[in-house]
From Swiss-Prot:
Catalytic activity, as annotated: O-phospho-L-tyrosyl-[protein] + H2O = L-tyrosyl-[protein] + phosphate; O-phospho-L-seryl-[protein] + H2O = L-seryl-[protein] + phosphate; O-phospho-L-threonyl-[protein] + H2O = L-threonyl-[protein] + phosphate
BP-aspect Gene Ontology terms: dephosphorylation; endoderm formation; negative regulation of ERK1 and ERK2 cascade; negative regulation of MAPK cascade; signal transduction
Keywords: Acetylation, Hydrolase, Nucleus, Phosphoprotein, Protein phosphatase
Maturation and modification: Phosphorylation in the C-terminus by ERK1/2 inhibits proteasomal degradation and stabilizes the protein.
Domain Tyrosine-protein phosphatase: 195-336
Family annotation (Pfam families): DSPc (PF00782), Rhodanese (PF00581)
Family as reported in the entry's similarity comment: Belongs to the protein-tyrosine phosphatase family. Non-receptor class dual specificity subfamily.
Domain Rhodanese: 41-159
Localization per Swiss-Prot or TrEMBL: Nucleus
Provenance organism: Homo sapiens
GO CC annotation, single: cytoplasm
Protein's name in the database: Dual specificity protein phosphatase 4
Subunit structure: Hollow spherical complex composed of 24 subunits with pseudooctahedral symmetry, has a tetramer as the basic unit.
PANTHER family assigned: DUAL SPECIFICITY PROTEIN PHOSPHATASE (PTHR10159), DUAL SPECIFICITY PROTEIN PHOSPHATASE 4 (PTHR10159:SF111)
Length: 394
């Protein structure tokens, strides 16, 4: 057990005062500041969210950094995780921790009331162990009551996913009417109803219709568009930045060869504090595939998590069979790359004698036709019915 002597506790009211002071003082407390809060002593505090990616995405304490501790990480950890495993995309945070630049780290889960109630194999416990090995001079505190209590008492210091406007289902046609799967009772195709959906604060997903609506784009603060098609026009080239990925929505298309270029483009827009709309014709297959690849690469999550995350925001996404297969292969490469980085890290797990870390293929390019059945099951993700399975070396 993680005992009281090993882990200090912090009341929600104390964290609220820190955040309020930091906000009034103009300090770094936003989500773009790597979870850093200013302390009265002049030091800096790091806020770590130890909940799963989907829970963090649904709502989180402002400025917190989400740690990665999914099933794959737990299986490999064997009771001990590295900073590279739990913070794979936060190089600056890892460097600051190792340099002792944080005076304190506050960790929180969903609702743990006290440190003594934590299990040894809980995410918080594993994270605390990693912090104690790599940031020995840093105070570590558990937020009492976790996100559940803090968000209940101080919702103004939390960010929650906006409720999505429900898209009315198509009205079943009568026996005398022709079947039109693409339209609802209002005559507007289902994929064009509503507006683009927010995947991340700087990343939106939509259709060609949305890309042609300048009023929608301006209302969302869109500054760039990623056109994942060979035939959709770029309507406002003098007003927005454009990039085209000429991929057809068929089983022969190699969309994975564009993954890294698309990811770099999205990051470039993000770095300029812009917002990008990724679209194809319907915003269902090609553009959804790019958004899934981005989440997998940058958030270091598996396809299962990324798919569920995007589907919660745009329920009609359905990458074609080949694209799903290429995403599964991309998942293997992302995981293999993470493992190689961990093995090369000074604090990473020791390599077993005679074994070498997995080496990913270059450029994350996979060009092959595959068939992956996509079905809608209420209690499982579509691609889980696929005959394709991946067994990452790590």
């Amino acid at each position: 057990m993680v005992t009281m002597e090993e882990l200090r506790e912090m009341d929600c009211s104390v964290l609220k005062r820190l955040m309020n002071r930091d906000e009034n003082g103009g300090g770094a407390g936003g989500s773009g500041s790597h979870g850093t809060l200013g302390l009265p002593s002049g030091g800096k505090c790091l806020l770590l969210d130890c909940r799963p990616f989907l829970a963090h995405s649904a709502g989180y304490i402002l400025g917190s950094v989400n740690v990665r501790c999914n099933t794959i990480v737990r299986r490999r950890a064997k009771g001990s995780v590295s900073l590279e495993q739990i913070l794979p995309a936060e190089e600056e945070v890892r460097a600051r921790l190792r340099s002792g630049l944080y005076s304190a780290v506050i960790v929180y889960d969903e609702r743990s009331p006290r440190a003594e109630s934590l299990r040894e194999d809980s995410t918080v416990s594993l994270v605390v162990q990693a912090l104690r090995r790599n940031a020995e001079r840093t105070d570590i505190c558990l937020l009492k009551g976790g996100y559940e209590r803090f968000s209940s008492e101080y919702p103004e210091f939390c960010s929650k996913t906006k409720a999505l406007a429900a898209i009315p289902p198509p009205v079943p046609p009568s026996a005398t009417e022709p079947l039109d799967l693409g339209c609802s009772s209002c005559g507007t195709p289902l994929h064009d109803q509503g507006g683009p959906v927010e995947i991340l604060p700087f990343l939106y997903l939509g259709s060609a219709y949305h890309a042609a609506r300048r009023d929608m784009l301006d209302a969302l603060g869109i500054t760039a568009l990623l056109n994942v098609s060979s035939d959709c026009p770029n309507h406002f080239e003098g007003h927005y930045q454009y990039k085209c990925i000429p991929v057809e929505d068929n089983h022969k298309a190699d969309i994975s060869s564009w993954f890294m270029e698309a990811i770099e483009y999205i990051d470039a827009v993000k770095d300029c504090r812009g917002r990008v709309l990724v679209h194809c014709q319907a915003g269902i297959s090609r553009s959804a595939t790019i958004c899934l690849a981005y989440l997998m690469m940058k958030k270091r999550v598996r396809l299962e998590e990324a798919f569920e995350f995007v589907k919660q925001r745009r329920s009609i996404i359905s990458p074609n069979f080949s694209f799903m297969g290429q995403l599964l292969q991309f998942e293997s490469q992302v995981l293999a790359t993470s493992c190689a980085a961990e093995a090369a890290s000074p604090s990473g797990p020791l390599r077993e004698r005679g074994k070498t870390p997995a080496t990913p293929t270059s450029q994350f390019v996979f060009s092959f036709p595959v068939s992956v059945g996509v079905h809608s099951a209420p209690s499982s993700l579509p691609y889980l019915h696929s005959p394709i399975t991946t067994s990452p070396s790590c």
